[in-house]
């Protein structure tokens, strides 16, 4: 498994959706412990990811004339893939560093999954991320996203 996480940030810089994939070969006790540890640092992780993306994107804007130059960055442990929509919605994948660019996949997720299952969904109501169960709380979007990502050759 080489895709670790997917995030959506609003134009107000708030994480409105997060989905993580965990390796399936761990035993249940290790999984439970890691989930408890992860829940305590989720909010900080989401803020740190956005801070890094925001800083790098601004630096790239100052260096280059093209506004859409920043698409990914790589460390020794992970690679971050970035796509920003015309409405300033930001989609991010965290993957294995050896994966090629997934910007086209992020665009596809936005146009086929997000627009269809969140924007056009007649029963979906937006809840601000600051609320207890805030952000994108649409189960059909989460399930379809999970199925779509699992079909990718890099998963």
From Swiss-Prot:
Asked whether the keyword Transport is assigned, the reply is yes
| UniProt-listed PANTHER family | TRAFFICKING PROTEIN PARTICLE COMPLEX SUBUNIT, TRAFFICKING PROTEIN PARTICLE COMPLEX SUBUNIT 1
Q: What does this protein do?
A: May play a role in vesicular transport from endoplasmic reticulum to Golgi.
Cite the SMART domains for this sequence: Sybindin (SM01399)
Q: What is its subcellular localisation?
A: Golgi apparatus, cis-Golgi network; Endoplasmic reticulum
Q: Which superkingdom, per the lineage?
A: Eukaryota
Q: Which family does it belong to?
A: Belongs to the TRAPP small subunits family. BET5 subfamily.
Subunit structure as annotated in this protein's UniProt entry: Part of the multisubunit TRAPP (transport protein particle) complex composed of bet3, bet5, trs20, trs23, trs31, trs33, trs65, trs85, trs120 and trs130.
Name the encoding gene, please: bet5
Q: Which UniProt keywords apply?
A: Endoplasmic reticulum, ER-Golgi transport, Golgi apparatus, Transport
**What Pfam families would the database entry show?**
Sybindin (PF04099)
Provide one Gene Ontology cellular component.
TRAPPI protein complex
Q: What name is this protein filed under? A: Transport protein particle subunit bet5
Could you mention a single GO BP entry for this protein?
intracellular protein transport
